[in-house]
Amino acid sequence: MLTINLLLAVGALFWIYFLWSRRRLYFLMLKIPGPIGLPILGSSLENIITYKRKLSFRTKYLNKYGSTILTWMGPVPFIVTRDPKVVEDIFSSPDCHNKSQHIVNAITSCMGNGLLGKQDPHWLDRRKHFNPSFKQDLLLSFFHIFDAETKVLMNLLDTYVDKGEIDVVPEMLRWSFKIAAQTTMGSEVKHDEHFKNGSLVESFESLISHSTLNILMPLVQNRMISKICGYDKLRADNFSRIQKMLDNVVNKKVNPLPKTDSDPESNIVINRAMELYRKGDITYMDVKSECCIMIAAGYDTSALTVYHALFLLANHPEHQEAVFEELNGVFPDAGHFGITYPDMQKLDYLERVIKETLRLIPAIPITARETKNDVRLSNGVLIPKGVVIGIDMFHTHRNPEVWGPDADNFNPDNFLAENMEQKHPYAYIPFARGKRNCIGSKYAMMSSKFALCRILRNYKISTSTLYKDLVYVDNMTMKLAEYPRLKLQRRG
């Protein structure tokens, strides 16, 4: 009995010391409103119970406490904001370049340590090295890939015409994966069997889901717990399948034929990574990790952006008809018509539709930054060093204080120049902002617009599912609890 009492006393003393050592943190953090949660656990239990509905979890507290709130993950503070002014403070601060280390660990444990996982001071040099892979002249050289793979997609969609409502998401994912793999790794990847049969889409989807699980339920990152639950084997099996494709292509790059600067593939991701490998700056495994992460980041978001745009237009036929009229004016002949960059620049209405889609259903629902030093926000609040701040894109884009009482409604006219002039520049952040914004934002817009040109010019889209009935799932990338089926009818 004495031993138990002694242990309890020692434990209590350690807990008091722990709280006392963090008194400045608590003093500063408790100035921010938000749910206190349970003792010791904070809001962790509610997070675990509602981890598939965390968007509604954040909606509830942002509406209750204001646009910047404090939650507690156990003893760890986590700030969430939808306030454009605070978003600007974070994205523009040199002390907020680092991503949350917890999220970085969750992703790199599944996909390796690429650009996405780099922190200060290393991320900037790596980012500069890969910037040429996303310059416009290189993106324009990808048009033949967009064209070929979109033709394959259209041939598949043709088989669904007048067949009732069908699930188009798997086809969208395969279409986008094949484009992302080729634009990341070059034409050699087309000869890989896993690429040809599209089986790697499921493996990448599994890794993305596993990364999300690591983020939302940190205990799963423990190797023993992961093994007991079977997640470790599942991750290893899927990663192994992806590695085989990566090895097949990367091995051919170790001793390549000389390339000239005029070679259109000289600046693609794999070749930029191989430059670092030959200099001894990164390992062979790092080359594969860069390719793996770039493919994963590129294909999932582009595919679902196209799908979400189709679904929203199916729910708003007047806007779909306006898009069709615009497309018909630029591409009078249906079928497999050619698309050039000047053609795409004429499509102002379609551009606004894509932007409005990304406002309502952003590809990434939330991103997180960790303060490297104390950061003073424009509202006067001081955020201590080491605190994680979640920039909630989903709720920033639906903030009624910025977008008005109809913030949840689909309206492409939100992006008319005269309407955007009235908005805070950080009110719309689908690809983040600042020095560490999304490196592939132009690629995502270009590939999505290309596919939507062909699909919406050739088909009328409808659905029996209402937009208001969508259930959003908080994932590493935006997901829906269920993907409504779409009906395709041919246009002339």
Swiss-Prot record:
* UniProt-listed Enzyme Commission number(s): 1.14.-.-
Provide the GO MF annotations for this entry.
heme binding; iron ion binding; monooxygenase activity; oxidoreductase activity, acting on paired donors, with incorporation or reduction of molecular oxygen
Name the membrane topology term. Answer: Peripheral membrane protein
Determine if Ubl conjugation is one of this entry's keywords: no
Cofactor(s) needed, names only, are: heme
Recorded GO CC terms:
endoplasmic reticulum membrane
Predominant localisation class: endoplasmic reticulum
Q: Which residues bind heme?
A: 438
Q: Which Gene3D superfamilies match?
A: Cytochrome P450
InterPro entries listed in its UniProt record: Cyt_P450, Cyt_P450_E_grp-I, Cyt_P450_sf, Cytochrome_P450_Monoox
The compartments listed are:
Endoplasmic reticulum membrane; Microsome membrane
Name the Pfam families on file.
Answer: p450 (PF00067)
Going by the entry's taxonomy, the superkingdom of the source organism is recorded as Eukaryota
Which keywords does UniProt give here? Answer: Endoplasmic reticulum, Heme, Iron, Membrane, Metal-binding, Microsome, Monooxygenase, Oxidoreductase
According to its UniProt record, this protein's enzyme class is oxidoreductase
Instruction: Name the protein family.
Output: Belongs to the cytochrome P450 family.
Q: What does this protein do?
A: May be involved in the metabolism of insect hormones and in the breakdown of synthetic insecticides.
**Full protein name:** Probable cytochrome P450 313a1
Biological classification of the source: Eukaryota, Metazoa, Ecdysozoa, Arthropoda, Hexapoda
